[in-house]
């Protein structure tokens, strides 16, 4: 299956998105991930999740496959700045160990998990300082 209709710049690592990504165009194939920005990970995952596994449909599926997720934290490699990072490579997906469910983070690279889901922040992981 093609890379969300992208002509070049994706490579085989982007395979498996196709129409399942929902309206993907050439912009979502830069640089390698065809699962952003229109369909990336739900907020439980960081901006870099799709890129880290080649941007395949399976990657997005493991995070929920929501169309809005990555948009909430920038939706692109450059978007990790909004999560406290200058580059996506310093953002990491992480999840709560207890107390908040899957919508917040708890890790050395993230802000602590709150005791209630409503106060869990941020949407995507912070840069490791």
From Swiss-Prot:
Keywords: Keratin, Repeat. Residues 28-112 are annotated as: 6 X 4 AA repeats of C-C-X-P. The keyword Repeat applies. One of its GO terms (cellular component) is cytosol. It comes from the Eukaryota. Sequence repeats lie at residues 28-31, 34-37, 40-43, 90-93, 109-112, 119-122. Expressed in hair root and not in skin. Expressed also in liver and skeletal muscle. Belongs to the KRTAP type 5 family. In the hair cortex, hair keratin intermediate filaments are embedded in an interfilamentous matrix, consisting of hair keratin-associated protein (KRTAP), which are essential for the formation of a rigid and resistant hair shaft through their extensive disulfide bond cross-linking with abundant cysteine residues of hair keratins. The matrix proteins include the high-sulfur and high-glycine-tyrosine keratins. Interacts with hair keratins. This is Keratin-associated protein 5-6. The gene is KRTAP5-6.
């Amino acid at each position: 299956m093609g890379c969300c209709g992208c002509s070049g710049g994706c490579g085989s690592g982007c395979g498996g998105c196709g129409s399942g990504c929902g309206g993907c165009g050439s912009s979502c194939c830069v640089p390698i991930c065809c699962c952003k920005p229109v369909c990336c990970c739900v907020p439980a995952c960081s901006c870099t999740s799709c890129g880290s596994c080649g941007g395949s449909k399976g990657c997005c599926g493991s995070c929920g496959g929501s169309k809005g997720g990555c948009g909430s934290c920038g939706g692109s490699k450059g978007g990790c700045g909004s999560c406290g990072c200058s580059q996506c490579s310093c953002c990491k997906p992480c999840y709560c160990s207890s107390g908040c469910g899957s919508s917040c983070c708890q890790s050395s690279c993230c802000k602590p998990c709150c005791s209630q889901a409503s106060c869990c922040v941020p949407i995507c992981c912070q840069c490791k300082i």
